[in-house]
């Protein structure tokens, strides 16, 4: 389980998940270890927990939590509110349209700071707003829709919600990079300590290459840069020393 800097997709902290437990206590322990003052903590639905919200606020940060079926009552309440057209028209709204290869992605965010009606609002530390993101994917063959709901301790605009919600996807992107470039899903190492160490080294390598790409404004794929580092020691030195 990792903590990432959303804007850059860089991993700056991680913690192992106990085999007899789950990710929730690991996330809470990691939040206590990190300096999160002034940070917006974006977490997936599994970590939409009241204790996680409390720890975040006590650490000086703010939270944006995705609300799904593990919080069924809260999700149902938010869904009923947002799907009421009369209520939705009074929410702050922002829409973006992007073309991704042969797919057009339209995202519309809705945000309201009126949390007075939420029955359990007192249980969520510093709850200040809620929102939803409606995503529509259009291809030549079909059109699909998705709704995602959020709560936050920080008063957000719809534009800010779209920005922060996108950072949640960087975690999935990192998993994809690790599997694509290091075949992590096919790793058969059984020793847990070795697994953790290899995972750290892989993420360090990805971090270094991302930093190099950012500082050099390189558009080259990560795989090409990795291959160059393998063949050229001077390139390897350039990439690994780009932060110094």
Regions found by a protein language model. Give the residues of each.
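Conserved, well-structured functional cores that handle cations and Mg-NTP chemistry
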Residues: 1-43, 48-51, 217-221
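Short, conserved catalytic/metal-binding motifs centered on acidic residues
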Residues: 9, 27, 40-48, 63, ...
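Short amphipathic alpha-helical "interface-anchor" segments enriched in bulky aromatics
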Residues: 151, 155-189
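A short, flexible helix-boundary coil/loop motif
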Residues: 91, 178-244
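Phosphate- and divalent-cation-binding pockets in alpha/beta enzyme and binding domains
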Residues: 51-52, 73
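Short, surface-exposed basic-aromatic patches at helix termini and helix-loop junctions that form
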Residues: 53-61, 83
């Amino acid at each position: 389980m990792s903590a990432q800097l959303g804007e850059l997709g860089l991993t700056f902290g991680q913690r192992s998940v106990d085999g007899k437990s789950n990710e929730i206590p690991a996330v809470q322990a990691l939040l206590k270890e990190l300096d999160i003052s002034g940070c917006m903590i974006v977490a997936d639905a599994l970590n939409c927990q009241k204790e996680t919200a409390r720890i975040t606020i006590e650490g000086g940060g703010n939270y944006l939590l995705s609300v799904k079926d593990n919080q069924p009552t809260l999700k149902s309440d938010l869904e009923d509110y947002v799907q009421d057209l009369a209520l939705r028209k009074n929410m702050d709204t922002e829409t973006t349209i992007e073309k991704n290869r042969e797919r057009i992605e339209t995202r519309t965010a809705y945000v309201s700071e009126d949390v007075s009606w939420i029955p359990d609002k007192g249980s969520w530390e510093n709850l200040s707003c809620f929102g939803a993101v409606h995503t529509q994917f259009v291809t030549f063959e079909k059109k699909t829709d998705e709704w995602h709901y959020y709560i936050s301790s920080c008063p957000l605009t719809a534009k800010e919600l779209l920005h922060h919600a996108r950072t949640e996807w960087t975690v999935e992107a990192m998993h994809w990079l690790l599997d694509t470039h290091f075949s992590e899903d096919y790793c058969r190492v059984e020793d847990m300590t070795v697994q953790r160490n290899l995972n750290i080294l892989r993420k360090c390598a990805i971090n270094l290459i991302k930093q190099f790409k950012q500082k050099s404004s390189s558009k080259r794929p990560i795989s090409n840069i990795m291959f160059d580092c393998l063949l050229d020691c001077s390139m390897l030195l350039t990439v690994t020393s780009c932060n110094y």
